[in-house]
Amino acid sequence: MPLRGVIIAVVAAALTVPSAPAAAEGHVETFVAFDPAAGEFPEGIAVDKRGNVYVSLIPANQICRIAPSGAQSVVAEFDAPGLGPAGLAVNAKGTIYVAVSSLNLATRETDPATRGVYRVLEDGTSERLPGTGAMLFPNDVTLDKRGNVYATDTSRGAVWRISPRGSAEVWADHPLLKGSGAFGFGFPIGANGIALRHNTIIVANTERGLLVALPIEPDGSAGAPTVLAESPALVGTDGIALDVHGNIYAGIGVQNKIIRIDGDGSIVILATAEDGLNQPSTVAFGTGRSERKTLFVANFSLLSPAPTPAVLKLPVGEPGQPKP
């Protein structure tokens, strides 16, 4: 997910990224606004089956639940040093899974004592899943129907799988998941946003502008990866979400864009800074009857000289894929 140093390092490069076709799918509106003075910058976002929106807030290091009415409540807090909770997902039972990086921006190191993937129960208690402290940079998560959690390890350039039994292992480690180091952050920024489509894991490689597909084999192992899309217009891609047709939606904070990548690899711009985007990090589809065709956007804005941290709503004309 977007990082302070990453954004600084790639702003200049982002300004030279070729434009993609624009599409006026809907009007961007603010769902809820946060307080930058309180460290409330939304990084990750997820929506449960009841239509509640969950966001990770850094450096406040909280997870906030937003009811369909807009009412907010803190459901979890983390003692992680530096930047804590990042990408998150919610299962059908309302259990939250979140990647906690514990990134110290001064040293550019993560804290092995607190980093990992955490499970947050409805009562607000949380526990680190066994073995995930070995991850170098936990960043985003997705879930399958079997209860497996898949998590990106950004600096290592890998995907981990945590089984329902709690065992964590490196599931996929491939050059296509590795960052190039081009952002100059001190370590590569590779595998980042992650989503599941049927029996395929889709991963965004931030520095290299790639979307990579990893099939889940019948025995549960990772199959050979393939490139779904590759373009300078994808450099900086962060969190991703899919609609019912398999089109991929992504937040690109360094470009102030929300884009859609169609099945043929074509890229369409859905919203820009002119629509109120301010370093958007990631996106998630609504689940309520009136919100299934709405994309909820984490308007991160951590580095903006005029920060406007918020959750935005963007109608996109297609419903999100059903949750596992």
List each model region and its residues:
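Short loop/turn segments that connect beta-strands within beta-propeller blades
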Residues: 66-71, 120-125, 163-167, 215-220, ...
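Short, solvent-exposed loop/turn segments at conserved positions within beta-propeller repeat blades
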Residues: 58-59, 105-114, 154-155, 206-208, ...
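Hydrophobic alpha-helical segments and helix pairs
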Residues: 116-172
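Blade-level signature of beta-propeller repeat domains, shared across WD40, Kelch, NHL, RCC1
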Residues: 284-324
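A short helix->beta-strand "capping" segment at the edge of beta-propeller domains
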Residues: 23-39
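Beta-propeller fold detector
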Residues: 29-33, 73-79, 127-131, 169-176, ...
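A short loop-to-beta-strand structural motif that recurs across blades of beta-propeller domains
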Residues: 62-64, 115-118, 158-161, 210-212, ...
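Beta-rich, blade/repeat-based domains predominating
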Residues: 35-50, 58, 79-104, 128, ...
